[in-house]
Amino acid sequence: MDKFQIDKNKHRPWQQCFLYPVLFQEDLYAIAHDNDLDKSSFSEPLENFLSKEFSFLTVKRLIRRIRQQNNSIVLSGNCDPNEMINRNQNSYSELILESLAVVSEVSFSMRSKPFLEGINEWKSFRSIHCLFPFMEDKLPHTNYISDIRIPYSIHPEILVRTFRRWMRDVPSLHLLRSILHEWRDSSSTENLQKALVVSGEKTKFSLFLWNSYVYEWESILIPLLKRSSHSRSLLSGFFPDRTLFDQKIKHIVVFPHQISTKRIWLLKDPFIHYLRYEERSLLVLKGTQLQVKKCRYHLFKFWQCSFHLWAQPYRIWIHELSKNCSSFLGYFLSVKMKPLVVRAKMLDRLFINDLITNELRPIAPISSIIRFFAKERFCVISGRPISKLAWTSLTDDDILDRFDRIWRNLFHHYSGSFNQEGLYYIKYILLLSCAKTLACKHKSTIRVVREELGSELFTKSFSKKREFISSSFSKTSSQRELNWNGDILQINPLANSWQKIQNKK
């Protein structure tokens, strides 16, 4: 990175840096393999792996065979086993992909850095729950929400064309093209789609493809939204790598005073707020139904012209916030009217006014959580707790810690839900399932377990000091305030699984 920065300071085009020779540096594969070790439970020292199983000469041969583009490209699994040295061909191919991602990220990071540094209004947050206060502030003032599912079935040449804009190293582009085409033409036709969808097993190469694709998508889309919007402000937020939330406030255009108020109402475009997390995007608009349909039409045209994608209509859903709910980040989102009574006393007169405001009501899918618990054998489908037989071989501390971790993650993720009474029913299921698991392990009853452990069962597991929303139950539903927990870096796995099911509908 420092060397590339020096070349850039010498007025050399940094896009022309030769990245391909870096692929033949042995240290690069050590970095890629070390990164793979961090993500797995494999604990063998790296030097042992390099000395016993790693053959740098084999990696060079694999790269040459990939570039030849013959009928026995190594990624298809037809490589000569004699060329492998105590290591199968798939592992070497994955190592090459990881190393190619490491090299490409150097150029990609240098490209995106000036773009982010040039925007002084960007603010970064590490919690995904910074998104919910943003939505709580903006959604009540809008009336339509457009649920966008970013297309991922994209032709390899479109990706290569995207990479050519910021990577002008021809050998690296040829290698990337060969890998993408072979991936597409292999026996599994969904390989490339799996590489672009943020789901399942995430490799460095798949995340690099997805981030570069979404970066290109948003670098074109957001300026178009800014240009088409004549509102006073445009706000957008997204998560590039699942951990960063960016919010931008930019003043665009102010209408001239010569235009009358009625003409302003006819000419003014809707307020547009753009939000994204992984493959889900939300366009929140304030306008008429005709304007929202026009926005949807232009999005389809944008996909066709920029990425040659003919997306299906189900990729963009339009919901009216006052009538329908939209699922996002494991919540059901809706906007409801909230009546307020304002009393103002002036001298001897008392004025009482009734005001109606809108408020965001995020709802946790309690019934879906119970179904997931039934699938994992914590309860039956009706919600009656049962013992977790698979955990009876663990120690008491491990059992308590596991139940405590499940409750803590769920409680933190759904801390801002409007139906928090349902969370305490989830707590009851986990608490009783924990007691039944311990009773089954010791071949006793729940009463005996409670007498032996005493308060430890309820203090070590489901610690009360973590629960900061209990005071909200003393209030009425109209006075309840939403408390968002700000220390969550990614979506809860259970909520993520439920969200994927909603995406397929």
UniProtKB/Swiss-Prot annotation:
InterPro entries: Domain_X (IPR024937), Maturase_MatK (IPR002866), Maturase_MatK_N (IPR024942). Coiled coil: none annotated. It is found in: Plastid, Chloroplast. The keyword Lipoprotein does not apply. It comes from the Eukaryota. GO terms for biological process: mRNA processing; RNA splicing; tRNA processing. GO terms for molecular function: RNA binding. GO terms for cellular component: chloroplast. It holds the Pfam family MatK_N. Keywords: Chloroplast, mRNA processing, Plastid, RNA-binding, tRNA processing. Belongs to the intron maturase 2 family. MatK subfamily. HAMAP family: MatK. Usually encoded in the trnK tRNA gene intron. Probably assists in splicing its own and other chloroplast group II introns. This is Maturase K. It comes from Sciadopitys verticillata (Japanese umbrella-pine).
